[in-house]
Amino acid sequence: MADLANSNLGAVTFNYDIKIDLDTSFTGKDLLRTRLRGGNFDQSAFGFAASTGIPSPFGGTYATASGLEVAFEEGDGLNIDRLFYQFPIGSDFTVTAGGRVRQDDMLAVWPSAYPSDTVLDYFTYAGAPGAYSLNLGSGAGLWWSNDGFSISANYVSTNGSDGNPNTGGIATDGASGTGTVQLAYADSSWGIAAAYTYSSMNWGTVYESTATPLATAVGLLGNSNNVGLSAWWQPENSGFIPSISAGWGLSSTSGA
C-alpha cells in the first residue's frame, strides 16, 4: 500500500497562485472588493486530486492531508474569485452581499489564530469542516459586533448564477446552499466561537483532504446539520511560545 501511494505522490512540481485585490470605498467605511485570481495547481501539490491511489471499500480512493488551500485550480486562467460589497449600518451592524462571496467573508470572527487561507487545506476549517465549509457563490450576510461579542448570519448559494430552480438559484432545491449562524467572543489575544451551518443536499461533499472518502461524501446523502466549537489563544508578544488553535465539529445528515 505504501509503495502504491508513493508511486502517485513522488514527482517534483512547480506551481503558482496569484491574487490581485481591487478595493474601492465610497464613504471610507464601506468596501467594494473585486479579487482576480489565477493559478495552475491541482487539488494537491502532488496532483491526482490529493489521492493516495489506495482504493477505499466505500468508493473512490483514500485522500492525503496534502490538499492545498492556496491552490487555485483553473489551468492558467484568470478568474473573478471575489466580488462583494460590504457596508456598516450604524456602529454595530455590517452587511455583506455579492455575486462571488465566501462564507468567511461574512463572519465577524474567524475562529482561529491562523487565517482561513492557510497552506494546507486540512488546517483551513477551524476544526469543523462541516460548519466552516467556506462555501463560495452568491450570497448575503449580516453581523452585529459590540465589545468583543458578535453574532453573524449568512447564506451562500454555490449555483446562484443559474436561473433554473432545479439546478441553481437562491434558496431553491438546486441552489447548493449553506446557511450559517455564529456566536463569538474575541479580544486581541484569544477568542471562542460556536457555529451552526445547514447545508442542502446538492451542496455536495466536504473537501476530501479533511477526512476519509466515506466521511467527506456524507453530504451527498441528504441535507446536513453541522455544528462547530472553536477557540484560540496567542501570546501578546511574538517569541518562542506558539499560538494555539483548537476546534471540534459534528455533522449529521437526513439521508443516513
State the predicted function of each range.
Residues L9-S161, L183-S188:
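Outer membrane beta-barrel
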